Amino acid sequence: MSSRGGGGGGRRGGRGGGGGREGGGGGGGGGGRGGQGRGDLGVVGERQGGGRGAGERGGRHDAPRGRGGVAVGAGAGRQQQQPFHAPAPPSGGGGRGGVQVQPNAAARRPVGGGRGGVGVPAPAPAVAVGALCGEMKGKMVVSGGAPPAGQGSSLAAAQGTDNVKREPSQVAAPAPAPPPATLPPSSSKAVTFPARPDVGTIGRRCRVRANHFLVQVADKDIYHYDVVITPESTYRERNRSIINKLVALHKQFLDGRLPVYDGRKSIYTAGPLPFKTKDFVVKHINPLRGNQREEEYKVTIKQASKTDLYSLKQFLVGRQRELPQDTIQALDIALRECPTSVNFTCDRYVSISRSFFSQSFGHGGEIGSGTECWRGYYQSLRPTQMGLSLNIDISATAFYKAQPVMDFAVQYLNIRDVSRRLSDQDRIKLKKALKGVQIVATHWKEKSIRYKITGIPSAPMNELMFDLDGNRISVVQYFKKQYNYSLKHVNWPCLQAGSDSRPKYLPMEVCSILEGQRYSKKLNEHQVTNILRMTCERPAQRESSIIEIVNTNSYGNDDCAKEFGIKVANQLAVVDARVLPTPRLKYHDSGREKVCNPSVGQWNMINKRMVNGGCINHWTCLSFASRMHVNDIRMFCEDLVGMCNNIGMQMNTRPCVDIIQGQQRNIEGAIRNIHRQSSEKLDQQDLTGQQLQLLIVILTEISGSYGRIKRICETEVGVITQCCAPKSLQKGGKQYLENLALKMNVKVGGRNTVLEDALHKKIPILTDRPTIVFGADVTHPSPGEDASPSIAAVVASMDWPEVTKYKCLVSTQSHREEIISNLYTEVKDPLKGIIRGGMIRELLRSFYQETGQKPSRIIFYRDGISEGQFSQVLLYEMDAIRKACASLQEGYLPPVTFVVVQKRHHTRLFPENRRDMMDRSGNILPGTVVDTMICHPSEFDFYLCSHSGIKGTSRPTHYHVLLDENGFKADTLQTLTYNLSYTYARCTRAVSIVPPAYYAHLGAFRARYYMEDEHSDQGSSSSVTTRTDRSTKPLPEIKENVKRFMFYC
């Protein structure tokens, strides 16, 4: 059973469906000379040395369909049961035909090699090493002497596929060793981000307009003053009213200065005030108390610091790395002062974060469930390469409609009969929707008092009792006695204001929702559709709207802007850009089109076959659509199977068991029943051990069942599903079936397409060495869901050099915690000692198990963090990545490139008025990249629009490099990111964000379904204990036969 360096291909490949695990073809085993094992398959139980042949990557380049995949076959031998090994292995030779092992981040000194073999590290003293692979238990000792007889080289076992020879046509020239990994600083204050290495040059040059307006500032000293208002107020609107009144009443004490206020604890002035500290007294009417007497407030103003513009100017020209945040903040507040002022002469704006909203902008309207759309604009001052720029964009969001609470409840709950008692399910739903909303009580004629809703008690008004003068009285009786008011909806519950210990009960029918309150809860599908329809604007229309905002705001005439010497240009910035070349995509050789050249970011499957079609032998269909006849469902399944087989999959034409019509009221029972029937049928056919591979589910006509189906199937039953909406199914069409087939293929382990340059190892940095690409994201619960945890998802590529298959892991963490806490973990066990785990460690180990190679590089795309979190996230998460790597092998520190992916920004790019520079929707072309003028003055960032617009204005994605140990140039990272956008599995279009980040986003949202409980009453609790308990509750475990595939697609 001795294996040589270049063995044959996998022997399992058959006629079935091309690539994947079944693909045969040329590939080499990886055993060292004299080692024991099988060079073609590496079967579990064989001794170390053998690797798997072509297997996972397909077989001969010229093989017909059913014989393998594309030309990647040469020898990525998998070594079953061989994890990352420990510190330096014993010296010895490699297998015949091997190539020089490239060093990892940690330097190694070659001391010898076998015939045609490899250099190995210097011998080290014996050390006990914990086995890191799941199948291997216990401990082993690696010594510095000669290998034991019959075991071959430990280096071949530990690094076997680093020295496996590939087909000559696919081996790129040896790349220089990556730069050594560096440890992150111990404090976020010491974090510095990499400087821009250069400016990109690849691509067709063009010019675009950006919604950035150049800002010039006079050279004035800016003073920062701390403000303390007593008694303390948390309402910004009230604080602004108090400060505005102070400025109006006490001008003589301010030396003619016009201060600007942030609404909290800071005031800024252009020049000093005539005092260091001063107290003022301001009388103000509190609207929450109604039309009562004025309240007296003490306002203390104390000088905090002085800033000048020199540091800002130095930063803008790249001579200073630290941003003078105080200066930027003062100028930003000065530009925001006019629209936030309660004395603003235009229609009143509602300020939310950096945006301003008003009904005067028009185009709004009701969007359903008691809500309406308000339009507005976003404004932010940003340091850029061209200097300070004011980023202005059109914005829109949902607001509560100003109306009686009863009207809102009827619309939100879709209730027709208000005389009925409100169900507990509806009460909880309404409670979550109204928590935190300000209302005004209307049963007093002489005054109006505002309240904030804190809850809805479970008892109806006629049963809700409280003590009054030593007697028990109901809310209904109290209103009759106190106000001579006869309540109508006595079967409905009250609203609660105040705390649980001192509650105030208010009947819904005497309360109205105040205008101008943002609806921050999750929008339903109907609301999303309506708000998108109302706000969708073509690029030319959006550009005109932005210019109109600038002209309306008239910054040149604004008193605060004049006070601080600020001048804002009234024209959009014209920016140099490039359109990157489109990558070529490889499809299966059995199709008429073996290589595809996408056009304007899209293509189709006509005359093409999946590069690695998956095999589905056992499937069935379960329908919950009561209005669809079973014959229609049967015809749909036949069409879907036909499509799958036509474009490269191998799918059994007959279901494992016949289609079953399930009942919506018993979803779980129907799923378990069809799974049990399928298992029994397979056992009857002597297919024991095999299981249902795919369950096609026709959803109910009523929304809400999708998440429950996914949770049951993926965490309890253990079967991959493809859900279909009845509406989409009835429309049908070839395109719909094709999209379903693409999703189904990757869910069962296939590949739809791969980058041609990846196959030929022509992508710099990605394909010169084994590289793993990560994507990470954190999703947070909707505002108001203060008892729900945040969910983190991390995906990692499991194939190389193709980089198309991604495994996904998910975990819960503390409520609204952005840093991913489960990247690396250590738990002390009294019996086993320290148990190491975490998502990075598991994914690195999975990569090794799938490819037989250790990643020599890491590229980490991190989604979902804002600029203010950059340092903290990088510091913590890089530390976790380092520890995860080192826990697998001493000294294992592959270089990392850490890139933040930002989609939620407000930069928009508009094309010049040339038809060859825009797509059919009027947007910039896919591949448009900008890394000058509107980008960071010195750091490594760029805007990339990788997708073609469909409706509205395309939003480019902002990529910001926080760490780069791989030495990327601008062109290399921009091209890699753009090329990867063509590998997204669910459609034949380039997508707007890099797929690993997209997949992490999908994975995190999928996991939300595993624990969502719409009818839980805990979401409204203000208890810290409840929040903590819920946040640490782990997710249910995803079944192993589901987790190993891209189930989340």
Swiss-Prot record:
Coiled-coil annotated residue ranges, if any: none
Segments of skewed composition (Basic and acidic residues): 54-65
Record's keyword annotation contains Hydrolase: no
Residue intervals of the PAZ domain: 404-515
GO molecular function, one term: RNA endonuclease activity
Gene Ontology CC entries for this record: cytoplasm; nucleus
A single GO BP: regulatory ncRNA-mediated gene silencing
Record Pfam families: ArgoL1, ArgoL2, ArgoMid, ArgoN, PAZ, Piwi
Region (Disordered): 1-101, 144-192
Keywords: RNA-mediated gene silencing
Origin superkingdom: Eukaryota
Skewed-composition ranges (Low complexity): 144-160
Biased composition (Gly residues): 1-53, 66-76
PROSITE patterns: PAZ, PIWI
Domain called Piwi: residue spans: 694-1012
PANTHER family: EUKARYOTIC TRANSLATION INITIATION FACTOR 2C
Record family assignment: Belongs to the argonaute family. Ago subfamily.
Stated role: Probably involved in the RNA silencing pathway. May bind to short RNAs such as microRNAs (miRNAs) or short interfering RNAs (siRNAs), and represses the translation of mRNAs which are complementary to them.
Name of the protein in question: Protein argonaute 12
